[in-house]
């Protein structure tokens, strides 16, 4: 009965995690290419929105991550330059979501660290950001305006070409990460974005 369904669900999540991990390994290989390997006729994304669109078209990634229109708009406006790094972290975000489905009782920070997000993951925005600059972190999900406090920040600069943020929540019902805001770093106590 219930135990069998749980085991089947865990097996599906494990298979999905393996697929996502393979994609992460492929992206990591792009970050540190083997000098003997030559890849021809492969169009690299030229913008953050192209990276996002490529991932959203991937069934394994999109089974772990939902991207809201507000985040797509932010990616369209983004001038972030390190697109290979962005792709790697967004792939890891899918792996993070798959792990959170089955790792109840483990802190999100520990799961993030295990999935290669330790240096860029934060579980919440600051109190000042959430209160004074809330509009930079709000998106609508399931009919309600919500603060998307969990986030990844790639790079640490007020220069939008060198810093990229993705703000999200974990939807318990679907077991997916929902990205509500993406692109430039929102205002907080340490930025003037």
For every predicted segment, state its role.
Residues 1-164, 171-193:
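Basic, Lys/Arg-enriched alpha-helical interface segments
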């Amino acid at each position: 009965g219930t135990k069998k369904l749980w085991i089947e669900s865990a097996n599906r999540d494990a298979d999905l995690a393996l697929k996502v991990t393979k994609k992460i390994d492929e992206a990591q290989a792009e970050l540190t290419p083997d000098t003997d390997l030559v890849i021809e006729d492969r169009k690299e994304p030229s913008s953050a929105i192209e990276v996002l669109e490529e991932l959203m078209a991937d069934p394994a990634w999109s089974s772990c991550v939902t991207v809201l229109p507000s985040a797509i708009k932010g990616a369209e406006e983004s001038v972030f330059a390190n697109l290979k790094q962005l792709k790697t972290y967004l792939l890891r975000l899918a792996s993070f979501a798959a792990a959170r489905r089955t790792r109840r009782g483990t802190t999100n920070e520990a799961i993030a660290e295990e999935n290669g997000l330790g240096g860029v993951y934060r579980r919440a925005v600051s109190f000042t950001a959430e209160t004074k600059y809330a509009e930079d972190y709000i998106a609508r999900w399931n009919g309600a305006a919500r603060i998307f406090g969990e986030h990844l920040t790639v790079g640490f600069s007020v220069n939008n070409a060198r810093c990229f943020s993705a703000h999200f929540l974990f939807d318990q019902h679907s077991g997916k990460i929902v990205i509500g805001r993406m692109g430039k770093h929102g205002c907080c106590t340490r930025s003037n974005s």
